[in-house]
Curated annotation (Swiss-Prot):
Residues 1-639 are cytoplasmic. This is Junctophilin-1. Residues 433-454, 599-613 have a biased composition (Basic and acidic residues). InterPro entries: Junctophilin, MORN. It is found in: Cell membrane; Endoplasmic reticulum membrane; Sarcoplasmic reticulum membrane. The gene is JPH1. The MORN (membrane occupation and recognition nexus) repeats contribute to the plasma membrane binding, possibly by interacting with phospholipids. The lineage of its organism: Eukaryota, Metazoa, Chordata, Craniata, Vertebrata. The modification Phosphothreonine is found at T448, T461.
Amino acid sequence: MTGGRFDFDDGGTYCGGWEEGKAHGHGICTGPKGQGEYSGSWSHGFEVVGGYTWPSGNTYQGYWAQGKRHGLGVETKGKWMYRGEWSHGFKGRYGVRQSLCTPARYEGTWSNGLQDGYGVETYGDGGTYQGQWAGGMRHGYGVRQSVPYGMATVIRSPLRTSLASLRSEQSNGSVLHDAAAAADSPAGTRGGFVLNFHADAELAGKKKGGLFRRGSLLGSMKLRKSESKSSISSKRSSVRSDAAMSRISSSDANSTISFGDVDCDFCPVEDHVDATTTETYMGEWKNDKRNGFGVSERSNGMKYEGEWANNKRHGYGCTVFPDGSKEEGKYKNNILVRGIRKQLIPIRHTKTREKVDRAIEGAQRAAAMARTKVEIANSRTAHARAKADAADQAALAARQECDIARAVARELSPDFYQPGPDYVKQRFQEGVDAKENPEEKVPEKPPTPKESPHFYRKGTTPPRSPEASPKHSHSPASSPKPLKKQNPSSGARLNQDKRSVADEQVTAIVNKPLMSKAPTKEAGAVVPQSKYSGRHHIPNPSNGELHSQYHGYYVKLNAPQHPPVDVEDGDGSSQSSSALVHKPSANKWSPSKSVTKPVAKESKAEPKAKKSELAIPKNPASNDSCPALEKEANSGPNSIMIVLVMLLNIGLAILFVHFLT
């Protein structure tokens, strides 16, 4: 056997022993352009036992076969380490993957580099999942056990379904600190707590409340007991119907439960849960979520048995609250839409009861099946730990072969550069710098969950869209700048000085001679229009819609600010809207003059204004608009109260007849 150094055309180099033109014995080989390094033993051109070091500092130490990692070995990648078996370059069959910074780890079976079969996953906060896996996701039967509520991780960005496991890992091996435990759980909840619901039905009931909503008291003629329990701590009386709740479930449930990637300022209010409370789910899993039949139980006595969909109570089931009361029926996105309660006309009561009973039986069977799968997962975990210990011994042997190969390479070619140790030193130095300067990385953490460049989710915007969106949003933003500066400031001054309708009429009359002093014909034509602008500007829908495009709220404009606006023709025509946008720029300084002069003459002009209001009936519609609105406002509650009293009498009569019969 001979040896030496051989330089490849792609920039790689081999330095070590060879036989019959192939690497044999001990040696070091670098990849193209000198990137990456393998050092260890060789056999007729293939690696046998040794270690490979990537330029990033990631390493593998163990056994090889046909140029691929095969057998036992240890891989260190970023903040994660895998110890166990390898099969043709992929992780499997048994192995342990653990975090170097947190308690997060997975112990069990693998297939094609993903969790598959049976295993136990421990999350960053200490919670566990024991059961079946498929394609790297929880799939089958399993048990999810949380830690006490006070120690559970707060979910802030629902990107992944594991707290700090493989599916929370970025491409460079690092872990997202804000990874979530449930993709469809609201931001701000705790990992492993899916029964932590605020009063979703009650919040929705407030939006669609009232006795006169369609399908309530008169719609279905169905009365419920005062037992609306949609959360742990909030139990309030209500009168609801199935039709009303079915409308609430789809739209309002999404607005109160599913928050997606939002800041925690908009998180739902959490229920008052004791810090020592734990939660356990036993049942079916599909695609890494609670789907099918299952039982979720808390240590404080709350329990749900029934059907699940996407980590939510969905289907038929029964909820038992800590005080012993029950809520059973059909759920839709965590909201009870059909309950089993006393009704005037018991329609579908028996069918609902049968479906609930079947759902409870199915949930109990699924929980029993999950417990049996846990036993199998624990046995697989014990075997995986044994393989991990054997992999440590294989890594030790690989390091010894690596040291021999480096010594041989130094003897054959003393000037040969071995990049492997420098890769490891560079990675270690980066870790030390990160620990010494933690303050520099603290402000960099918040933007990572928002950008998350290493994740792709269906429906997300491609990376090129943000480049075009600022250009599109910048051009319209430049035009409303003068409007923002003029309208709110002048409107605020006028609102402080003139708070009543009479004062606004005074300003319209006082400003009339000021505007008529202009010698041009345009100003003279605009003068009578300024009288109506102060009165009709608030109820004008077209003008309000125009300014809501720029400001997001209705802007109150006075007569001296926009003299050329034709309010009488402002019923949605394009000419009036264009005048509102372009003409105020020509009269930028006119509002300042018109505001200062009427203030000085305001005390003298008050008696004239009162006389002019009585003498000049130029706009009777504007003068009578406010009293008409007041009459309608005063007559509205009276009619509502009359109908309310009638309906209450009818309801009491129906109840009286019902109790007598």
